[in-house]
């Protein structure tokens, strides 16, 4: 059996840059899957991607399928022949379906009996007869949200296809994909090198494309070169480039022959908040901003061209010419916005709906300011500042800058608040109200900002749940899952003394009679506890540990966190397994008993030494641990409770709980109930596996 390199390249018009990598990775994944299904052995699978091509190269692909041993089981021997030894209808029908006579069948003996069996070897087909179809199947599974059609063909793809190349070694694999016949033609760079050329062997790829076509097909090589060249360009002007990976990946997906240039803009534009300038550079123009060593934006930017220009100064001038009017617009918007304070813009919020049934943004900020003040009073933040920040939190949505650059909401509010002499804590809270915006994002930095961020998110959660617009499946138009997790992260990571029950109740009260969901508070709590479960699972906590804590239905997020940390630590202790098993036994005894345990232990009814010893330990710990539970020292409490392992083990070995004597039985149930109650002050450890 021989092996050859297999190459498939699909030449297209410019592919969407933000999805280029996911397209080619999926192509490689599904093609590998199809090769494996076809029993074609192969080596390493490598993918290549540029704006005008998707390619996959498979090393050491077997040129012939493996032979496959096929087995077809028939009826059991007992049903295959009658008492006289003659074949039954079931046996003859099975043999006919296999194309054999019954005497050609073998038998298969298993622990369940003996069966008729026919096995044969299916010879492998040549890879060249299979590959075109396997490529088609792989391409049909790519994650494409919107397909295009072109020309007279019925074929549809993310972009029009111009060339298809399928090579197994030096053999051209015939096939028609997207209406295009497979051929050896490879397209080069649009403006450099050879426009097209012939490839003779799969091993020539991608080097031949680099040499003849002036196309760097290796995505990671291109990405690394761009990053290195940008860093060098920034260093030449004493700057540090802002190279976010998302932008770097997008630019890598936009060019086939990257050439880095440095351009500049007028210093006067630096008077505009840097966030607006950076937004224009990165989001609109795909430029890389640069900063000085102090972190201040400099009047330069770095861009990546897709050509080795004959006139670099003209190319740089052209890009500077493009950015200048955009910056001039931003400067005009900014200066115009400064003429009106955030407070003066409040009435205009009455013209914007928050949600049809929940009223306008003006009504929302009235609620947010009140809830911010209430939260501030609970967590020790400045109440006056929190109320003011809540009131002004949405005013920047009515400014020219935010209308033009929506991503700067909050940021521009901070700048405008500072310009109009609002306290810095108020200004910062306006900016940080949206944090955390995504997983791993920063949290609000001050207690005032925490108050506003929690208030804004809780107002949205309460309102949308209140009109029964709950998230369903992957549909969450109001971002309620993100809002819930944001609230939980702030409370837990800032260790804030907030209770979800009272927080939600206050948010509900501020809505007046707008809400119609009668089960609102419980629904929101359950929803947020569900977010807890997902968050802590992703953080590596066992689902049984999470369930053990959730069984207590804690409504204080910081308290939940303390409990889960304590349980996670407890599981590492030698005594944990035995105590968990004993707790399950205690739980089963109590749940199955028809008797109702007494609230206290009658020491006069304790007869056996083992129950006397256990009761003494429980009563001592009950008294000792009371302040631990009040202070939330759950880990320390569990460290003390492990002392119950030995007396509990001895108790179960020497004492019968469900005795006929009712007084003794009820007293022993009370003893176990006391023990279980101690552990339940932390979590229900009977859930632990």
UniProtKB/Swiss-Prot annotation:
Keyword tags: Aminoacyl-tRNA synthetase, ATP-binding, Cytoplasm, Ligase, Nucleotide-binding, Protein biosynthesis
Compartment(s): Cytoplasm
InterPro entries, per database record: DALR_anticod-bd (IPR008909), Gly-tRNA-synth_bsu (IPR015944), Gly-tRNA-synth_heterodimer (IPR006194)
GO biological process terms held by the UniProt record: arginyl-tRNA aminoacylation; glycyl-tRNA aminoacylation
Alphabetized Pfam families for the sequence: DALR_1, tRNA_synt_2f
GO cellular component terms attached to this protein's record: cytosol
Domain of life, per lineage: Bacteria
Catalyzed chemical reaction(s): tRNA(Gly) + glycine + ATP = glycyl-tRNA(Gly) + AMP + diphosphate
EC code: 6.1.1.14
Coiled-coil annotated spans: none
Signal peptide start and end residues: none
Molecular function in Gene Ontology: arginine-tRNA ligase activity; ATP binding; glycine-tRNA ligase activity
Annotated SUPFAM superfamilies: HD-domain/PDEase-like
Subunit annotation: Tetramer of two alpha and two beta subunits.
HAMAP family in UniProt: Gly_tRNA_synth_beta
Annotated family: Belongs to the class-II aminoacyl-tRNA synthetase family.
Name the record gives this protein: Glycine--tRNA ligase beta subunit
Organism, scientific name: Hamiltonella defensa subsp. Acyrthosiphon pisum (strain 5AT)
